[in-house]
Amino acid sequence: MAIGEVYETYDAVGLAELVQRREVTPKELLDEALARVEALNPQLNAVVMLEEGVARRLIEEGLPEGPLKGVPFLLKDLGAEAIDFPSNNGSRLFANTRYGKDSSIYARLKAAGLVTFGRTTSPEGGVGPTTEAAVYGGPTRNPWNLDHTSGGSSGGAGAAVAAGIIPAAHGSDGGGSVRIPASSCGLFGFKATRARLPDGPYVGEGWAGMAIDGFLTRSVRDTAVLLDATHGPDLGAPYVAPPLEGTFLGALAPCERRLRVGFATTTLTGEPIHPECRAAVEKAARLLESFGHIVEEALPHADTPGMMAAWTKIVACGSALSLDGTVRRRGRPLEEGEVEPIALSAAAYGRTISGAEYLESINKVHAYGREMAAFFERYDILLTATLAEPPALIGRFNHTSDDYVDYRMGPGRVFAYSPFTAAFNASGQPAASVPLHWTADGLPVGIHLAAAYGHDEMLLGLCARFEEAAPWFQRRPPVTLQAVRS
């Protein structure tokens, strides 16, 4: 089989099946992925810190007999600590950081048989809806339109998967960082219930429990298999998610249950959204009705502005901890240009927040979760857009601002652009971005679905129903290997 001719026609599960049937080898898949990096990355700036030698050694030593044996894979350059894969964490300050132990999430991905060969770009500190970190020498671009962002903070993962370099990639999500790139790049992105995936051993929880690992994929079943391979608490986890009824893959089977769906064509606080985003929500609502579900307009009665202010404080405290801890450990102050202005501003703001204010912010986030839970007493699903606009132009959300609070909460800034996703990091509920709509200019627009805490399986099954009714897998962006070679 000439794998290069058909590589993009398979998802990760499909490629693993080819390996299992010995129609292709892991080495051939790795060679193809590396060739695609060489051909496409100069335009996208999505893949960094290649470790080809490590990947070839993994294959030569014998891959585990996991469900994704032989499939090429990339880790986000933020978290997913691994002995064989140093990281920059999106920052010059942390460039080429090495680890003495594999993180639990990477150990499970490795056991699944994946062949990791590098990392994907992330904004510094994972803060922002775009990926334009100085450490990478330029922005990461969207394969659907190179003038637009691929999203953030898992923007490199989104661009790499959308362009067909790999079928699936690791990401993480503390305020929408899997779902925003999914919406921006025409992919599926799922944020699981809080603590569904392991955080250890390097942290007990990320951003007071708001952050979690995840994946960018072109098919719902790839996400299901990746979740099945990685979910569950690791040693010493401070708390665990509610148990599953079965498996994530099993949850994709048809379900006859009639759901009650609330939907909004505005933000959670009633502001208008872009007409293309509104059109995506209306299309999804019609599809849900055609599935036989009860669909009506509804908004949660929750203090979203208060949650956003609390989120902003918690993340700022995390920035201060990260920067100050690094300076203390190395024994010398920051040098000019080591850290971008927005991260410096976030850390400075974090230092002004007292311990009592930090705990008050956590209490606010928890109260918000209870307010959202009340909505899900009546409804099974909340449908909105993923973003309030189509993917932003490069430069709009770069990290040159020295006012972190305005960057997050000012008019037209991050929370105005992405007013939905962080709500479910705060509440801990499962949520997903589904690629249901494209603008007249050919830019992807995702719809956002959220379910009650712990109801991951029901939500994933509904996403699979959308995939069946409105397939997106064969939609390919202008920047692909075929386009580059033609």
Locations of regions flagged by a protein language model:
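Short glycine/serine-rich loop segments
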Residues: 99-234, 425-446
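Short, surface-exposed loop/helix-turn segments at secondary-structure junctions
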Residues: 240-243, 392-418
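Acyltransferase
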Residues: 23-31, 60, 247-250, 273-300, ...
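Short helix-loop capping/hinge segments that flank enzyme active sites or metal/cofactor-binding pockets
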Residues: 3, 68-89, 253-265, 314-373, ...
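A short helix-breaking turn/cap at a secondary-structure junction
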Residues: 191-284, 302, 470-486
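Acidic/His- and Gly-rich active-site-bordering loop/insert found
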Residues: 55-134
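An N-terminal boundary/leader segment
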Residues: 1-50, 290-292, 352, 441, ...
